[in-house]
Amino acid sequence: MTDYKKNLGIKESTAIVISRIIGSGIFRTPAPIMALVGCTSLFGLVWVLGGIITIFGAVVYAELTAMIPKSGGPYVFLKEAYGPYIAFLRGWAMFFVSETASIVAVSLVFTEFINAIFQIISGEPFGIFPTFILSLFTIWLLTGINLFGVSLSGKFQVVFGATKVIAVGAIIGITLTGFSTGDTGHFTDPFWPKDFGWHTVLAIGAALRYSFFAFSGWEGATYMAEEVKNPGK
């Protein structure tokens, strides 16, 4: 059995979770959520509901990790509860579908924002080939950092996590500044929809899918529970 080095403290573990949650989703999903609900009050409601539901899942994972402090996350939990077959299916689904798609999404959104900056400077966007190369390079770079070990990658996560928190804080600050000055011209129904019916409820439900994607990543620390100094925390 492999003995893992416990190189991750509470700071690094928290940074890993923050970096996974504040990924591509939080920067990419607000626009489609706003397009679905159409007003700021329901926009905020979607994020609050998504956050509450996410907290329920995170608390369950925290309890399971404290009870079963083993690396592997959902694979380990399913193996303990339902046996190796179900856990095997979940593990391969994560490898071939969910985690792989998540990595691709993060790299593409990163490239999309770099492309936007490049277009502002040069006046022309990237082509398909440069987009592919930059996305691939991003994946290779982050993979290379992780190959140097948990200790180094944990330190990078602290830096990346702090940078993302600052970026999100800046976006929130700019938004609140715009509303405080009465600049709501970008919204057709700034605070409440003109009519509220089943179509509004369905729109909120559809928008929740995007918020769940944006909040995904809270299970990140469970994958490396045996490399955390005190996983019970």
Please report, for each region that a protein language model flagged, where it lies by residue.
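Membrane-interface "cap" regions at the ends of multi-pass membrane proteins
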Residues: 1-31, 35-40, 54-62, 71
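Helix-loop-helix junctions that connect adjacent transmembrane segments
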Residues: 3-4, 40, 44, 122-130, ...
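Select transmembrane alpha-helical segments in multipass membrane proteins
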Residues: 7-17, 83-97, 134-138, 197-211
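Hydrophobic/aromatic residues within transmembrane alpha-helices of membrane transport systems
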Residues: 9, 23, 64, 83, ...
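Residue-level recognition of membrane-helix boundary sites in multi-pass small-molecule transporters
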Residues: 12, 41-42, 86, 152, ...
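Residue-level signature of the transmembrane alpha-helical core
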Residues: 14-21, 47-48, 52, 92, ...
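Hydrophobic/aromatic residues within the transmembrane alpha-helices of Major Facilitator Superfamily
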Residues: 18-21, 25, 52, 114, ...
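Hydrophobic transmembrane alpha-helices that form the core helical bundles
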Residues: 32-36, 47, 54-139, 143-147, ...
